[in-house]
Amino acid sequence: MTTLKDLFAGLLLVIFFPICSWAEGVKLQPVEVEAPFPMDSVFLCIFPQRDFLITKYGAKAGGKKLNTKAIAKAITACHLVGGGRVVIPKGEWLTGPIHLKSNINLYMEEGAVLRFTDTPSDYLPAVMTSWEGMECYNYSPLIYASDCENIAITGKGVLAPKMDTWRIWFARPQAHMEALRKLYTMASTDVPVEERQMAVGENNLRPHLIHLNRCRNVLLDGFKIRESPFWTIHLYMCKGGIVRGLDVKANGHNNDGIDLEMSRNFLIENCKFDQGDDAVVIKSGRNRDAWRLGTPCENIVVRNCQVMEGHTLLGIGS
């Protein structure tokens, strides 16, 4: 016979279990940054000790099997329990776009290579992003997050996209330039962003390698980048984070190292940049879109970085 006491105990268990689960989520460790201006602490994400190996979700190394779905399954599983590490083991892993979720640390073991495809259709459907300071819907960045918090890419692995198609797109033929003019016109006349569909026809607007859109508490730590279709790391309207110990080499057209656009409270340190364009850029949008969004960059410290090659060491508004 079920008593009232038994029912009450069961109710407590139902209430208490999810509280315990979420209590084991991401912790935020404040990091004081010495700066010549008042600056809030940035926060270092400390992720729970839960690992989700992509191999357990069907991923196979070797550079032949497309692992996009397996990686997405691992990210979703990790997200649903409150976060942890999605682990990319040693080996070469062929993939399309990787979309992060809140409380995810994409961790690459030493010897791990994420080899992104260069087939444009793999990066559809289009996502909300920006192109040279103007918001639009374009091909998904190779690694993308939108409106997430507590996200990281860490480890000693390498991000190394295939580049054959993107190199052809470097040429910026007439159709591409006409598409850009159309985007400028749409942005300057306040056409709604969802109507600025650019991943069509021969527009050839290349995707970013990493684009984090309106995210909070970001950590990029320790990995290497070898080549990029467009801007390499784009922190867009993000709040708070640490970028450290990166080794970035991308010598193609528009290959900025890191662009902080309309972002605040960031520490960039101990990174190495070898770029085909600017190394570090701080900017706040372009023309009408910039006024519409009205979000300045502020509280950014860049220190102890090496620039081997680049159009500028530090560009402001470039």
Which residues make up each language-model segment?
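Extracellular/periplasmic carbohydrate-active domains that bind, remodel
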Residues: 16-318
